[in-house]
A protein has these predicted regions:
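Active-site catalytic microenvironments in core metabolic enzymes, especially phosphate/sugar-handling
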Residues: 3-148
């Protein structure tokens, strides 16, 4: 299952040139949904990951930004791009407070969420470089254990 299925995204695109050349946010659209319902759907699809979120449960989400790793530092760019919600792997406390103040939802899904896309990236690299062996780490795991 890849990003678009996990997050129910359509029309995914890179917007880095629109803001600045260092912006790595990908933008996608979702059918109009309340934040609480969207978080529930993402949580169901990412059941092996611990997640948390910031924002008003009733906020309507239609445009979602996603960036792997500690991407909450892209909050300003997400707002400039018109995102209702930013999904990332790591959020600091002050970034969560800023998101609340500025009215954008944040979903923190675990820094290790990037692992979901390793096989997809492997397929892309094999097609681009058919004479090279492309391996995916089988040892790298999320160091955190979920406690439910």
């Amino acid at each position: 299952m890849y990003k678009r299925q996990i997050l129910n995204l359509t029309n995914i695109k890179a917007e880095k040139e629109e803001i600045d050349s260092n912006c790595f946010i990908r933008i996608g659209e979702v059918p109009q949904v309340k934040l609480q319902d969207y978080v529930s759907m993402v949580n169901t699809n990412l059941q092996d990951f611990v997640m948390r979120y910031v924002g008003c449960d009733e906020k309507i989400i239609t445009k979602v930004g996603i960036i792997g790793g500690a991407g909450a530092n892209e909050l300003n760019n997400a707002i400039k791009l018109g995102c209702d919600c930013l999904i990332t792997g790591e959020v600091k406390h002050n970034q969560a407070l800023e998101a609340l103040e500025r009215g954008i939802a944040l979903i923190e899904v675990s820094h290790s969420v990037e692992s979901l896309f390793k096989e997809y990236l492997q397929e892309m690299l094999k097609k681009a470089f058919p004479t090279c062996e492309v391996l995916v780490s089988q040892k790298e795991k999320d160091p955190f254990k979920p406690f439910r």
